[in-house]
């Protein structure tokens, strides 16, 4: 069908292709559509399927030609992209440049298409790369802190007949009062539950209710400073009526061997649990170190390369980042829409982070594509066995799932990516310029 195509790269990581289709194929496609019209048209004086082509062409020539052009473009692009050196991105629809296309049966049909492709770039040598990663130490205090968190997670909330203390879980009703001590109904709140000393309640009356007992009522007067956390209350006076309806406390379990056994049957002593916590922390350090090492490596490579990110790829990734930011911070996207249109006017921090992230993704994918590592049947079997064990499923059921969903090739690709990642990390030299504590390391930044 396609006689030939002229392809060239143009700025913006775009590809321009001139595609020529043989006039013989154009005529056959036209006749095919004409025949289809003939088989369905009802024309007075003729049976269906017996209408002369000349009559059909006289009435529907423009429609048939337009449909022929549409079919030719669709079919030829499908064929072209299958063997194209520069594959199109899935973020944007290819654009036909020709404003008006017409069929001339005496000539080959030609049109020009422009589409965005993965950017072209050459990878530098990464065989002797050095990456700075801090040396991390897990101390006994880190383990004890984690143990206390586990202790709190397993605490039982029970009724407390005493008075309110810091850490008490209380349920209150409250309302603002005016100068005549009448309730301002628009400020009334009922059954408000919070932990005293750990909340961020609007009026900040945690300390004011310490010592109160269940069913007690109290009027509290509050003067808020200029720097109060909620600006609408800053430099103001409020009078509140607070009714204490319920007091509860956390019954925290004792840290002993029985506590360890309650966490997991395989733990016989508290020391077993502590060792398990330490092992988990060390595993987390290893995973985080590897992630930082790869991130830093890709970031360093990206700084040396001029990679032109396609606009559609940027927009898609930016939208994902924006949605994540909106979800985490509970901000409506409409509030940010004015600053999220294209590359212009976007918050510089967001823009820079998205570009860095995309460059790192593209570099890693290029490394994977260039790597000759193969995924064997044994590799695939090992991964399926591991997933079956982790999910507590039968191996046959895991295999059936991947086969029915046609996901085996995707799984193979993931296995290869992990193999390549392991190979990269093995060859990268790690420099430890400083030591950091476990807690600090969790939020450690490499500067990428």
From Swiss-Prot:
Locations listed in the record: Cytoplasm
A GO biological process held by the record: protein unfolding
Catalytic activity field: [protein]-peptidylproline (omega=180) = [protein]-peptidylproline (omega=0)
Molecular function terms from GO: peptidyl-prolyl cis-trans isomerase activity; protein folding chaperone; ribosome binding
Record's protein name: Trigger factor
Domain of life per record: Bacteria
GN (gene name): tig
InterPro entries linked to this entry: PPIase_dom_sf, Trig_fac, Trigger_fac_C, Trigger_fac_C_sf, Trigger_fac_ribosome-bd_bac, Trigger_fac_ribosome-bd_sf, Trigger_fact/SurA_dom_sf
Main location: cytoplasm
Taxonomic lineage from the root: Bacteria, Pseudomonadati, Spirochaetota, Spirochaetia, Spirochaetales
Annotated organism of origin: Borrelia turicatae (strain 91E135)
Record bears the keyword Cell division: yes
Location of the PPIase FKBP-type domain: 167-253
Function text: Involved in protein export. Acts as a chaperone by maintaining the newly synthesized protein in an open conformation. Functions as a peptidyl-prolyl cis-trans isomerase.
Top enzyme class: isomerase
Similarity comment: Belongs to the FKBP-type PPIase family. Tig subfamily.
